């Protein structure tokens, strides 16, 4: 889509040689090593079942009751609009424990893909924000938590590198969107945006934020 290629190399001569190719218009630095690396996220222990006090008696939506009421989602559910037949891709930085949390076990997850380099050695052991996003849409656990689209199908796509902020992440995001399109996704949920980077010269100005 961007008519571009993301290349990783420690050889500066490679960059020089690439710019000599007739079909290469330009080359820019997309990633700079950060001064420090944060400690990897570690998955916390997850209980196989909920505690009795986790349930909210009297309302099948549980802890999600107020938010779905606010969005007037209950009448939609009552008329059958629960996301059935829709495929949703979630683009995020990680989906920690999404494969073990009880109220997420009934979600129809079609697959996962990791677009961050290097790829995670454990897809479900990264940051938890994507798990929260998945839960508010897809959770199906009556009287504990029911999301807004519990009958939809989902792709979980990791494209955010939490160790650094660089323009390379824009390419990770674009690759994830291209993948989502290729597998027939109907809706993309992306909680990501890019403006300020570790290399300040790469940061976008306000005027560049044109959508």
Q: Where would I find each of the regions flagged by the language model?
A:
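Solvent-exposed, acidic/flexible segments
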Residues: 11, 66-69, 126-130, 166-173, ...
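Short, intrinsically disordered, charge-balanced linker/junction segments flanking boundaries
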Residues: 6, 109-112, 184-186, 204-211
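Surface-exposed intrinsically disordered loops and tails
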Residues: 50-56, 122, 203-210
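Extracytoplasmic/secreted envelope proteins and their assembly/folding machinery
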Residues: 12-15, 21-24, 73, 130, ...
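Extracytoplasmic/secreted cell-surface and envelope-processing proteins
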Residues: 17, 36-39, 98-100, 197-201
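Subtilisin-like serine protease catalytic core
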Residues: 26, 64, 74-169, 183-186, ...
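Autoinhibitory propeptides
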Residues: 1-68, 74-77
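Short acidic, glycine-rich surface-loop motifs adjacent to enzyme active sites
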Residues: 177-207
